[in-house]
Amino acid sequence: MVTIRADEISNIIRERIEQYNREVKIVNTGTVLQVGDGIARIHGLDEVMAGELVEFEEGTIGIAPNSESNNVGVVLMGDGLMIQEGSSVKATGRIAQIPVSEAYLGRVINALAKPIDGRGEISASESRLIESPAPGIISRRSVYEPLQTGLIAIDSMIPIGRGQRELIIGDRQTGKTAVATDTILNQKGQNVICVYVAIGQKASSVAQVVTTFQERGAMEYTIVVAETADSPATLQYLAPYTGAALAEYFMYRERHTLIIYDDPSKQAQAYRQMSLLLRRPPGREAYPGDVFYLHSRLLERAAKSSSRLGEGSMTALPIVETQSGDVSAYIPTNVISITDGQIFLSADLFNAGIRPAINVGISVSRVGSAAQIKAMKQVAGKSKLELAQFAELEAFAQFASDLDKATQNQLARGQRLRELLKQSQSAPFTVEEQIVTIYTGANGYLDLLEIGQVKKFLVQLRTHLRTNKPQFQEIICSTRTFTEQAEALLKEAIQEQIELFLLQEQA
């Protein structure tokens, strides 16, 4: 027979009384009414904040952008296949945020900052809100430092400065992503952190970009944020904000960053899908009324910080695809009005073999020569005007049978100027090489050569200068000015190379 020991029972009761915690935990919960198409309708969650994260019973996380009188609309960050009608949901009390640290450099992550490159977890001690406010007027200063892309056509005529927002716009397959990736490759050794955000792209295209970065040693200073075409609309919508949060982390640490959004029109489509499923009223092209705010709050985060904040910068290059060159569509006009200029890529130029296919006539940088070193301003000042005049003259010359000598000379000069702007992909030029190239063309030294010889001659000239006149590069690097001494050295090198080149061609 079991004996009951009263002292043991009383000890257990005393222990339990001592351990008793009267703390009351309040949890804001709700019940799933309906789920499907990446959207859930929740009854309850009375005190949920706009944009608050909510957690479902089986672990899926969602964001609550819609609060209606009798339910809350939640967009799911996942497929939500295990969520059932009637299951419980609890509010987390947190707004969407991601971990941030230096360890993200060289990694490929998704919109939730989780690694997707199979190289293990990323350690981070800090976190940032995915949507944080843009710097105010006092926190900024005007753009004055150049961000070199390595592309002659851009750096000489449509210069981009650190802290600027420059749109890259054009039809599909015109080399928009190539311009952006070349700009990242050119940041090697420039102490610039790069973030490439792929929104709704094919997984194979993203893999190709990552492979290029790895082969060229660019991944060591680059973070790739990828949400491919098969990702849920919520994650495609969040990806650019995740990229911006990572770039801001470095900007506020007095570093220079470059962020590429490829492309915001896919983000707008994902946002349209979410909004229509949440039954928000549609507007133009079925986009919701706040689609302008979607992009403006993203692009306004790019800035050049004031001296008080350490002069860090975040330069944004959004890429927008047009349909048949129509830049007056809804999303292109929105982004054009937000950015500080646009680089327009033309399908006609691309098909004519002019690559990068930049239409210099209608491309513009609203920062202008403030984002160029003095040497580049001195050499490339008139190039854009000359090319625009040439394009006009070329169109006119098609209908004229006999042209005077001056017009023929201007056409010949323009053709050679256009030729020197051609560049192979993933082959960026240094500023010194660009100055050499433009000076040679703008001052008529290429007029002696046939158009087919221009590229070959310029390659040899740049090599000749590098090996035989290293002082030229030293002068440009140290003074950032095209001095008389530099000009004399360059003229001498051009004369030597022209004589040698013509002899080689005759032989």
UniProtKB/Swiss-Prot annotation:
Swiss-Prot/TrEMBL site (Required for activity) positions: 363
Statement: the UniProt record of this protein carries the keyword Transport: yes
GO cellular component: chloroplast thylakoid membrane; proton-transporting ATP synthase complex
Record's subcellular location: Plastid, Chloroplast thylakoid membrane
Membrane topology note: Peripheral membrane protein
Main location per the UniProt record: plastid
GO-annotated molecular function: ADP binding; ATP binding; proton-transporting ATP synthase activity, rotational mechanism
Any single Pfam family the record assigns to this protein: ATP-synt_ab
CDD domains per UniProt: ATP-synt_F1_alpha_C, ATP-synt_F1_alpha_N, F1-ATPase_alpha_CD
Record keywords: ATP synthesis, ATP-binding, CF(1), Chloroplast, Hydrogen ion transport, Ion transport, Membrane, Nucleotide-binding, Plastid, Thylakoid, Translocase, Transport
Gene3D superfamilies documented for this protein: 2.40.30.20, ATP synthase alpha/beta chain, C-terminal domain, P-loop containing nucleotide triphosphate hydrolases
Cystine pairings recorded for this chain: none
Chain sites annotated for binding ATP: 170-177
EC number: 7.1.2.2
Catalytic reactions on record: ATP + H2O + 4 H(+)(in) = ADP + phosphate + 5 H(+)(out)
NCBIfam families to which the protein is assigned, alphabetical: atpA (TIGR00962), PRK13343.1 (NF009884)
Function: Produces ATP from ADP in the presence of a proton gradient across the membrane. The alpha chain is a regulatory subunit.
Similarity comment: Belongs to the ATPase alpha/beta chains family.
SUBUNIT field: F-type ATPases have 2 components, CF(1) - the catalytic core - and CF(0) - the membrane proton channel. CF(1) has five subunits: alpha(3), beta(3), gamma(1), delta(1), epsilon(1). CF(0) has four main subunits: a, b, b' and c.
Matches recorded under HAMAP family: ATP_synth_alpha_bact
Protein name as annotated: ATP synthase subunit alpha, chloroplastic
Native species: Illicium oligandrum
Gene designation: atpA
